[in-house]
């Protein structure tokens, strides 16, 4: 019976062992194995409990020391901006909209505007002008028949030329009808030689009306030397001018005293008054009344033009006459400054159907080849300022 029982007990043991190896049922352990496994798990849990925080701290320190300090600079920049805002606005506004607007306005850098003051240094006064007869230092002789331009009138023209030329204190005679003859080609040649020596020089044209009924000298300032060309030339610095002696008022209305024939200062000033404020000054240029040089007595003064002698008249007194100077600057309507050909010289112009020698042009001043006649057209000059056309001298 015992042998029969042994095969019965051993038979179910084999499938139980095979079944546990497949993982379906837990293995059958003894007491020694259970004690060893429990002690090992306790040691592992205690080691991991202490090593994890140490590893975390060490890795954090390593990253802190090795990574670039981007976050630190950003934090410091934001802290600096906030401290700047606190200094600018020590009393914060509880309104969020106003605080946001103040932050946006303070973030923009204001533009520095310096405080400018007027300089105490002023340019010195201009040196008195000297008129020279040639390129040497010889002054123009005071003979009236050789002098069309007085120094007082030259000083008035000087105020209108470009500032760089106002500093020049001597004007030299480039061409004269008495000295060089009536030839337009000679005028061109003399101006060409002056331009070769002084490329930046300016030119003042002076023409005298010798008719008995008129006492007028007119001319122009030219930026370029006159020369024959097929088109207009010159700049906006060119201008036309005219000067005339004011007629004395009637003696019955302006005599200061009965004897001596001396006119009162008030009457002389009234004769050269500018137009009233209500007048139309659209085409009016610079208009000035200046005192001429003292006239010679009638017995000593030769028969010549009044402006050439600084406004001398036949009154026989030493009272200087009044010279009315008027300038016509560049108006900007067109660019017709100077136009010269071998047969004429013209200054200023327009584009209407009337002209002195052409049917399609108007000229401010036009001088013919023989230099014996001139004409003035209405281009940039009003009708009241026109001179008679075709006057001989």
Swiss-Prot record:
<comment type="similarity">
    <text>Belongs to the OXR1 family.</text>
</comment>
<dbReference type="GO" id="GO:0005739">
    <property type="term" value="C:mitochondrion"/>
</dbReference>
<dbReference type="InterPro" id="IPR006571">
    <property type="entry name" value="TLDc_dom"/>
</dbReference>
<feature type="compositionally biased region" description="Low complexity">
    <location>
        <begin position="70"/>
        <end position="83"/>
    </location>
</feature>
<dbReference type="Pfam" id="PF07534">
    <property type="entry name" value="TLD"/>
</dbReference>
<feature type="compositionally biased region" description="Low complexity">
    <location>
        <begin position="7"/>
        <end position="30"/>
    </location>
</feature>
<feature type="domain" description="TLDc">
    <location>
        <begin position="147"/>
        <end position="393"/>
    </location>
</feature>
<feature type="compositionally biased region" description="Polar residues">
    <location>
        <begin position="279"/>
        <end position="290"/>
    </location>
</feature>
<protein>
    <recommendedName>
        <fullName>Oxidation resistance protein 1</fullName>
    </recommendedName>
</protein>
<feature type="region of interest" description="Disordered">
    <location>
        <begin position="63"/>
        <end position="114"/>
    </location>
</feature>
<keyword id="KW-0496">Mitochondrion</keyword>
<comment type="function">
    <text>May be involved in protection from oxidative damage.</text>
</comment>
<dbReference type="GO" id="GO:0006979">
    <property type="term" value="P:response to oxidative stress"/>
</dbReference>
<feature type="compositionally biased region" description="Low complexity">
    <location>
        <begin position="96"/>
        <end position="107"/>
    </location>
</feature>
<feature type="region of interest" description="Disordered">
    <location>
        <begin position="269"/>
        <end position="319"/>
    </location>
</feature>
<feature type="region of interest" description="Disordered">
    <location>
        <begin position="1"/>
        <end position="40"/>
    </location>
</feature>
<dbReference type="GO" id="GO:0005634">
    <property type="term" value="C:nucleus"/>
</dbReference>
